[in-house]
UniProtKB/Swiss-Prot annotation:
Native source species: Acidithiobacillus ferrooxidans (strain ATCC 23270 / DSM 14882 / CIP 104768 / NCIMB 8455) (Ferrobacillus ferrooxidans (strain ATCC 23270))
Name of this chain's protein: Probable cytosol aminopeptidase
Ranges in coiled-coil conformation: none
Gene this protein is translated from: pepA
Binding site for Mn(2+) 1: D274, D351, E353
Pfam families per UniProt: Peptidase_M17 (PF00883), Peptidase_M17_N (PF02789)
Binding residue positions for Mn(2+) 2: K269, D274, D292, E353
Amino acid sequence: MEIAVQCQNPTTDNSDCVVVGIYEGGILSPAATLVDLASGGALRALLDTGDFTGDCGDTQLLYQVPGMAAARVLVLGLGSHGKVKDSQFRKAALAAARALQGARVGRASLHLLDTPVIRRSAPACAKILVQAVADAEYHFDRHKKPADAPQRPISELQLSISENDTAALAELQGAVAEAQATARAVAWTRDMANEPGNICTPTWLAEQAEAMAGRLGIKSTILGPDAMEALGMHLLLGVAHGSRQPPRLIILEYRGGAENQAPIVLVGKGITFDAGGISLKPADKMDEMKYDMCGGASALAAIQAAAELQLPLNIVTVVPASENLPDGQATKPGDIHRSMNGLSVEVVNTDAEGRLILADTLTYVERFEPDVVIDMATLTGACIIALGHQTAAVMGNHEGLVHDLIAAGKESMDRVWELPLFEEYQEQLKSPVADLSNVGGRPAGTITAACFLSRFTENYRWAHLDIAGVAWKSGEHKGATGRPVPLLVEYLLRRARQVA
């Protein structure tokens, strides 16, 4: 989909469809006012019928409106004037995109940047529009017959503003470029995560990462079991023992910054299918455990976006990829493995495997002498109980890093909430037979999982994102969401501005 920003009067816009907004109470946006005047009151007539009220997300498609160059006008409800929140603006944008799809519109022009959104600039609103349209356009249908695959009608999207301000246009075009890179990264993440476990194996995921890296000039290195054994990554290998698919450690290095710039390291959990191992999961919804590699896919996609935007940063992404299956050679509850950093771990529950593969990886990344390390993982069901499906959890050993991630999440509408990592929680990880246990019981499960990881991050600034509640959706709209890619890209953009 091609996206452009232009100064355009909606009445002379010759797109297939022009989109304008109306607020509750019949208040017309500036663009809608121009349409109403040119048409001799067509929008006022619509309001007089009572069929359209301006509620947020309401849509009404009008054909052959007098005085309009476009064949169609989509009227979009924006909610209460002066009180439009970013979440409402996104809801309206999604509704508009779906209405355009339903009308099979090829070229659409959105005259919505005149909408005052609380605490959001015009460039921020442009990003919301682009990402909302991209989300509405996304379909994962590669395994369906062509006749069953939904069409993607929008080929050209124009964001229109009323004033021909060169500086404003340039700023908006920059925001659109960032939003498009983010949207492509989100789509890549969703594509990887939506593939079934018989396709998305650790080896396949590594191959996809290598292909992406090759396209963008990113250095890629893939380690197998022999290299892991030589490094002493026995926690990662212990998780992989139950699978016939060999594990992979995927390492991508993007060097856009100065040679002496310490890298930002992204670590993502890459369990391509998680049956729980010997601590077998219930059958209900076990199919969704293909999404247990969403953290890994997100970390890979974030470096893709950084490379596309040519950010002046050094970034390293490391993804431990494995399956977690039951087998005669699988790790058993009570087994003890020694981690790469020398700590012995009693594996009380083999379904708490994500923290094991992350622990060895967090030790491995010390060799990059990182500025910061951010890991992301669908780690605990307890996080869903605590925060639901709207917000991810963030914890870490550096207050500034945690706050930076919270700010990036707020700006990108990919929000996170901080949970504590008080030292007292470490008591729950004590083991009578090893240096620590891989589980800390039911209380504060999300926190104790992060406490476990913290034992392997003492030599650098670190933050952990538990994305278990936000990485995918169940039910009718089942599928990966692409989170926390928007947060990660926004964080990297902010870091890049600091360098510039």
